């Protein structure tokens, strides 16, 4: 702990000779999920939203932005797009295994936000569907 009560600074490793820009898995991950809308789309997917209009309504996101983010998530195998209705044709978006494995990251962001950014404490209660 830092004397001011904040977290202690971590000293950089000076003996590491790796090109961090090329080898950084954090940077590579942020290329996929690093913008506000993408994280919120993933949050809503974990909440059970599946269809374009559901995401649009919940997030109040411009249609073109939502279409772009969903397309990118599908291209990167974080979500899969499946037809769920034939007439008219409608699609749903579901998390892949890769997408599901983002769960701890979203939970960590929520916990960090609850701790450091929320004046009233935790606004969200997580309940596991199978365990209650």
For the regions a protein language model found, what residue spans apply to each?
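Canonical helix-turn-helix DNA-binding module
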Residues: 52, 56-84, 88
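N-terminal leader segment of winged-helix/HTH proteins
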Residues: 1-33
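Short histidine
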Residues: 10-13, 19-20, 38, 42, ...
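Basic, amphipathic "hinge/linker" alpha-helix immediately C-terminal to the N-terminal HTH DNA-binding motif
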Residues: 34, 85-108
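Amphipathic alpha-helical dimerization/coiled-coil segments
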Residues: 104-132
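N-terminal helix-turn-helix DNA-binding core of bacterial DNA-binding proteins
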Residues: 24-65
């Amino acid at each position: 702990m830092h004397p001011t009560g904040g977290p202690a600074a971590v000293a950089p490793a000076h003996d590491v000779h790796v090109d961090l820009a090329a080898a950084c898995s954090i940077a590579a991950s942020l290329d996929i999920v690093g913008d506000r809308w993408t994280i919120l789309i993933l949050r809503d997917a974990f909440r059970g939203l599946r269809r374009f209009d559901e995401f649009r309504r919940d997030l109040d996101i411009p249609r073109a932005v939502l279409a772009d983010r969903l397309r990118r998530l599908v291209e990167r195998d974080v979500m899969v797009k499946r037809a769920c209705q034939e007439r008219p044709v409608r699609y749903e978006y579901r998390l892949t295994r890769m997408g599901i494995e983002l769960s701890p990251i979203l939970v960590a962001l929520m916990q960090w936000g609850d701790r450091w950014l929320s004046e009233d404490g935790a606004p969200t209660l997580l309940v596991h569907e199978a365990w209650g």
